[in-house]
């Protein structure tokens, strides 16, 4: 059985805009499957909100557009050789 998510995009966009206007220093989190929206699409959308985007793991950094700085939430013992130089890693 499949689950279909339908979002009222006008209402959702208004909610996001309202929230971002009241919270300073907001860093959007885009991880996993992008909460059903798709990680790449959601990451692109999140760059309208902030210049830094948080992702779950080093393997999700590739979804962050080059115009944004990726922040990795999960510490890693092995840093991939092709990880972007601007990625912020947690310890």
For each feature predicted by the language model, list its residue ranges.
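Active-site-proximal beta-alpha core segment in soluble small-molecule metabolic enzymes
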Residues: 3-6, 11-14, 24-91
């Amino acid at each position: 059985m499949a689950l279909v998510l339908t979002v009222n995009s006008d209402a959702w966009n208004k909610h996001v805009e309202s929230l971002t206007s009241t919270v300073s220093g907001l860093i959007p989190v885009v991880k996993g499957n992008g909460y059903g929206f798709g990680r790449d699409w959601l990451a692109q959308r999140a760059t309208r909100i902030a210049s830094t985007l948080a992702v779950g793991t080093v393997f999700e950094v590739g979804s962050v557009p080059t115009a944004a700085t990726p922040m990795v939430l999960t510490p890693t013992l092995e840093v991939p050789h092709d990880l972007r130089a601007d990625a912020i890693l947690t310890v």
